[in-house]
Amino acid sequence: MGLSSDSPVRVEWIAAVTFAAGTAALGYLAYKKFYAKESRTKAMVNLQIQKDNPKVVHAFDMEDLGDKAVYCRCWRSKKFPFCDGAHIKHNEETGDNVGPLIIKKKET
C-alpha cells in the first residue's frame, strides 16, 4: 500500500503531522533554552538573615572600619554582615564562586 496521487487526504495528513512535529520540536528546544534555565536560577539567596525586614541593608562609616573589613556576600555567615568563611562550604555544595567583599585602606 503505497502513496499515490489518488490519495490526497493521506498526503495532506502526512504533511500536517510532519509540520506539527517540527513545530513541537522547535517549541520544546526554545523552552529548554530560555525558560528552563530561568526557573532553576531563581533560588532564594538569603535563607535566614533578618527575614522580617523587606530589605537587608547595613551601613558603616569609613572611619569605623579601621585598616581592613571583610564582609559576607554569600549570606551564610554566622557573623553576618562580616565574613566567617562560610562561602567556602557554600561554594563546594553549590558550585558557586562567591567570595567576601574586602575593604581596606589604600596603601600610600
From Swiss-Prot:
According to its UniProt record, the EC number is 2.6.1.3
What does the sequence similarity comment in the record state about its family?
Answer: Belongs to the CISD protein family.
A biological process (GO) of this protein is: intracellular iron ion homeostasis
> What are the names of the required cofactors?
[2Fe-2S] cluster; pyridoxal 5'-phosphate
Report what the protein is called: CDGSH iron-sulfur domain-containing protein 1
- Crosslink feature (Glycyl lysine isopeptide (Lys-Gly) (interchain with G-Cter in ubiquitin)) location: K42, K55, K68, K78, K79, K89, K104, K105, K106
Q: How would you classify this enzyme at the top EC level?
A: transferase
